[in-house]
């Protein structure tokens, strides 16, 4: 029997897995804070709902990954303080992010998250950690589909030149 036999949760994590989890959680912490600010700026109720869904999902991901790190004697990255609620009308127009800008930023983040989850899955030796990243990947795929639908319905998509012939 080798060191990587048996229950994956009893196997040691390698530095790539640890770094992938730690970086993923750190990125989520930054996105949670940014999305809380976006909630304060957004006016579209559908967009606000998606932002709140993303925040909830990322907090759950961090909770699950934090348990894995702690079980392996590693301190998770620190979370940022929660942002207070504000009304979009109280933010000056020149300082406020517009809904299409917010949606565009989230779209970029979803794409980046898909790549980071895929990369992490590919370097994992522990099946349980790979499965956690696969779950996050699937959640991002589903979220991205909802966001794409919202972007199309609101007219927030700016496509490249379309081939119409």
Locations of regions flagged by a protein language model:
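Leu/Val/Ala/Ile-rich N-terminal alpha-helices, chiefly Sec-type signal peptides and the beginnings
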Residues: 1-25, 29, 42-45
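Carboxylate-rich helix-loop segments that flank metal/cofactor sites and access channels
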Residues: 2-4, 67-104, 108, 163-165
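Detector for Asparagine
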Residues: 7, 28-29, 40, 62, ...
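Alpha-helical scaffold segments that form or flank carboxylate-/histidine-based iron centers
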Residues: 13-21, 45-63, 102, 127-141
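Acidic/histidine-rich alpha-helical segments that form the ligand environment
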Residues: 17-40, 88-135
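Generic alpha-helix signal with a bias toward terminal, lower-confidence helices
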Residues: 36-37, 59, 77, 81, ...
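Conserved alpha-helical segments that form or flank metal/cofactor-binding pockets of metalloenzymes
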Residues: 45-81, 143-154
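A generic hydrophobic-segment detector
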Residues: 115-162
